[in-house]
A protein has these predicted regions:
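Glycine-rich P-loop/Walker A and Walker A-like loops and their local beta1-loop-alpha1 context
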Residues: 1-4, 9-18
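Conserved H-loop
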Residues: 11, 76-82, 84-91
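ABC ATPase nucleotide-binding domains
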Residues: 40, 118-158
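Conserved P-loop NTPase "ATPase switch" module shared by AAA+ and STAND
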Residues: 47-60
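Helical segment within the ABC ATPase nucleotide-binding domain
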Residues: 62-75, 87
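H-loop (His-switch) and adjacent beta-strand-loop-beta switch element
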Residues: 93-108
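Short acidic-hydrophobic catalytic motif
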Residues: 110-113
């Protein structure tokens, strides 16, 4: 798989087999279940300009994930985040959704998240902030869908 060097990706995976990961053999892969300090330390001396995370963010809080992304930006490192957590899709520019090794959806984050029925069928749903903002449009409290909780909160208070 080829990735654009200027784009951060989230790959939402559902029931993929081991061969799926062979397409990343040319990339540096950071494995799963790492804690923040360990992950940060590893990235501070990272030699490559592209890193693949395989469920590496599972134990991280939202603020820790943002901190990791800031560190990656500072070092000019782009990422591919392989995950089953729909919330992580909001941290990248581009999302590819796989089900059993078959690509189901692909596009910029907002385009993919507009496919709520397909995502729910695959067991994902929508990120909380997206779902909340959609629900609030039904009550005419908001007039658009939000992809960032800070922006949603700011607009609600104004």
């Amino acid at each position: 798989m080829m990735f654009d060097d200027n784009v951060n990706y989230t790959l939402l995976v559902n029931n993929v087999n081991k061969e799926f990961f062979n397409q990343f053999k040319d990339y540096s892969i950071i494995g799963n279940n790492m804690f923040f300090d360990e992950l940060k330390e590893k990235l501070e001396m990272f030699p490559s300009k592209r890193v693949v995370f395989n469920e590496s963010w599972f134990n991280l809080s939202g603020n820790e994930k943002k901190s990791i992304i800031e560190l990656l930006k500072k070092q000019n490192i782009n990422f591919v985040n392989i995950t089953s957590n729909i919330e992580d899709s909001l941290l990248s520019n581009y999302v590819i959704v796989y089900d059993e090794d078959k690509k189901v959806l692909e596009g910029n984050t907002e385009v993919v998240l507009r496919n709520e029925k397909i995502l729910k069928k695959l067991g994902y749903g929508l990120p909380f902030v997206v779902d909340l903002s959609i629900q609030l449009t039904y009550y005419d409290i908001l007039d658009k869908v939000y992809y960032n909780m800070d922006k949603l909160t700011e607009d609600l208070w104004n």
